[in-house]
Regions:
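Short beta-rich binding modules
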Residues: 1-111
Length: 111
């Protein structure tokens, strides 16, 4: 059974644009890290043209993108910044389950 651990670090890089799986998505890419660790995270949806074989619909994509923008808006508010590029250097607490990223949050307590 994997063990949960928390690490303190910062948002080292972040950008809005193409990213995710083989850069086939549109959204926000984050690089989070500390003294001896680093991890990437991506919030977004497929940017490629939908095929008839896709297991998602245009409505699904629009919903995912809307949810991502609202999540990003909340992150900006918690970090007390107004742009994605201003997130760089913001302190975070990251939770891992074994080696897998489970979640992360802005350390509002130290801002």
């Amino acid at each position: 059974m994997a063990s949960e651990r928390k690490e303190l670090g910062k948002i080292q890089k972040c950008h809005f644009g193409q990213g995710g799986y083989q850069d086939a998505c549109i959204g926000v890419t984050f690089t989070l890290g500390g003294d001896s660790w680093g991890v990437g995270d991506f919030w977004g949806a497929w940017a490629i043209e939908r095929s008839d074989r896709a297991k998602w619909t245009e409505a699904d994509r629009i919903t995912q993108l809307g949810e991502m923008v609202m999540r990003l808006n909340s992150l900006l508010a918690n970090a007390k910044v107004s742009t994605v590029d201003a997130l760089q250097g913001i302190p975070v607490e990251v939770t891992f389950d074994g080696m897998a990223l489970e979640s992360w949050r802005v350390l509002k307590e130290v801002l």
